Amino acid sequence: MKRRTAREKALQALFQIDVSDIAPNDAIEHALDGEKTDAFFEQLVYGVIEHQVQLDEMISGHLVNWKLDRIANVDRAILRLAVYEMVYSDDIPANVSLNEAIELAKRFGDDKAAKFVNGVLSNIKTDIES
């Protein structure tokens, strides 16, 4: 499975977990839709779940005039996924994570999602790198 596909499927699983409180294993199975699983895909889903409190704190610290629970579910899932990659995936450059998140926002979010995701993640990336 290509990493871009793994990210899309991880986003679908995380969105489903966030919206419906479905068990992670069930969300993973549903997102895979009969496809063979992938280590990177599972790492993303389980990693975001395991570190969600820390990820949410980082994201919340970079929101201006927003609260995390008021952000669209899909945008919140994209932010969590990207911040997880930036912080916990040493083999992935932060710019790649940021660009992939913007592409996910363009594909799955509304017309303002990509700009919003870019702004939040750019600030987080700057903090991580300093």
UniProtKB/Swiss-Prot annotation:
InterPro entries xref list: NusB-like_sf, NusB_fam, NusB_RsmB_TIM44
This protein's record includes keyword Ribonucleoprotein: no
An annotated GO BP: DNA-templated transcription termination
Any Pfam family the entry gives: NusB
Any single GO CC term annotated in Swiss-Prot or TrEMBL for this entry: cytosol
Domain of life of the native organism: Bacteria
One function term, GO molecular function aspect: RNA binding
Disulfide bond keyword on record: no
Keywords, in A-Z order: RNA-binding, Transcription, Transcription antitermination, Transcription regulation
General function of this protein: Involved in transcription antitermination. Required for transcription of ribosomal RNA (rRNA) genes. Binds specifically to the boxA antiterminator sequence of the ribosomal RNA (rrn) operons.
Family indicated by similarity: Belongs to the NusB family.
HAMAP family the UniProt entry points to: NusB (MF_00073)
Protein name per Swiss-Prot or TrEMBL: Transcription antitermination protein NusB
Lineage of origin: Bacteria, Bacillati, Bacillota, Bacilli, Bacillales
Gene that produces this protein: nusB
